[in-house]
Amino acid sequence: IYESTVYPGATEEDCIPVIERLSGLKYNVDFFAGYSPERINPGDKEHRVTTIKKVTSGSTPEIADFVDSLYGSIITAGTYKASSIRVAEAAKVIENTQRDLNIALINELAVIFNKLGIDTEEVLLAAGTKWNFLPFRPGLVGGHCIGVDPYYLAQKAQEVGYHPEIILAGRRLNDSMGKYVATEVVKLM
């Protein structure tokens, strides 16, 4: 059972052929595969491995049931059985891509509001009074996954002939925020 965040197709297109080649075994005959992406947030005391719903999948319907049952015996929040390994891989990579893009949007708004002389936190507090406003805050993208995972999806998209403009624009903006923040801090000194 793979848990790493990868682009859709990585498990079956890249990992499985290596196992077949090195072992001499045949996929879905001699061995099977499952995929269930990790969803933990390092340092988060509330959302722990057992309290976050787990997406599961398997290389056959029977293996999908086995993987789902295995995690279901551990995860108190429950499981969601995806229809395929690729669907589970895609679900995970878009979770992180969506977070990255939401942070990029707020970062861009913070730059604009700064240039307009408007306090971004005040704007976000006011906007947050609407029930469906997503409460993101400007800042640097951290962790081992959010700043990298969108590139996995972007690479796969480009391999199939699509240029993911929004995903890459979000990455460019978030990648530039370190320099922007440093410049603003120096101005305050």
Predicted regions and their residues:
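Structural/interface elements that position substrates and couple domains in central-metabolism enzymes
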Residues: Y2-M189
